[in-house]
Structure formats: C-alpha cells, structure tokens
C-alpha cells in the first residue's frame, strides 16, 4: 500500500499535500482518541478498584483539552465530599 502511494506521488506530485494532510489528520485523530481513553475521568478501565474516577478529581484539576478563560489553579471547592 505504501508502494502504491509513493508511485502515485511520483506520477502526480500535486497529490503530495493531500497525502500529507490526510496522514496528519489521521494521526491527530488517533492521538486525540488515545488521550480521551487514557486521561478522561469519564472513562473507567478498572471498575473493581476505581468505579467512579470522576469523584477523585479536585476542583483545581483541568481535564478539558483547552480552556480559554478559566484558571483552574485558583478555583475553590464548592461542594461536599463523596
């Protein structure tokens, strides 16, 4: 398959940016899904030892991908412990 892509790129050099952007998009999507699966508190891989991982998050921990206006280090806890 890689040989076929390289052959097409040699015959039609205008396809090279297309291959680069498709490869970068696929790689970015795979990395984002891996980040969600490993670091998101909504995902629990071990239900016996950690059934509710979202309860262990502190109020100053950021688990969003990107936050524009919120400084999580200055947030205070507003609720009971469970």
Swiss-Prot record:
The modification N6-acetyllysine is found at residue 10. Belongs to the complex IV NDUFA4 subunit family. Keywords: Acetylation, Electron transport, Membrane, Mitochondrion, Mitochondrion inner membrane, Phosphoprotein, Respiratory chain, Transmembrane, Transmembrane helix, Transport. Pfam families: B12D (PF06522). This is Cytochrome c oxidase subunit NDUFA4. One of its GO terms (molecular function) is protein-containing complex binding. Residues 1-14 are mitochondrial matrix. Coiled coil: none annotated. PANTHER family: CYTOCHROME C OXIDASE SUBUNIT NDUFA4, NADH-UBIQUINONE OXIDOREDUCTASE MLRQ SUBUNIT. The modification Phosphoserine is found at residue 67. It is found in: Mitochondrion inner membrane. Component of the cytochrome c oxidase (complex IV, CIV), a multisubunit enzyme composed of 14 subunits. The complex is composed of a catalytic core of 3 subunits MT-CO1, MT-CO2 and MT-CO3, encoded in the mitochondrial DNA, and 11 supernumerary subunits COX4I, COX5A, COX5B, COX6A, COX6B, COX6C, COX7A, COX7B, COX7C, COX8 and NDUFA4, which are encoded in the nuclear genome. The gene is Ndufa4. InterPro entries: B12D. Residues 38-82 are mitochondrial intermembrane. It comes from Mus musculus (Mouse). It is a single-pass membrane protein.
């Amino acid at each position: 398959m890689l040989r076929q892509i390289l052959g097409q790129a040699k015959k039609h050099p205008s396809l090279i940016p297309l291959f680069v952007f498709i490869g970068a998009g696929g790689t970015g999507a795979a990395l984002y899904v891996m980040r969600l699966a490993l670091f998101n508190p909504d995902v629990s891989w071990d239900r016996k030892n950690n059934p509710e991982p979202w309860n262990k998050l502190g109020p100053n921990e950021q688990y969003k991908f990107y936050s524009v206006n919120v400084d999580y280090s200055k947030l205070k806890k507003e609720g009971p412990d469970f």
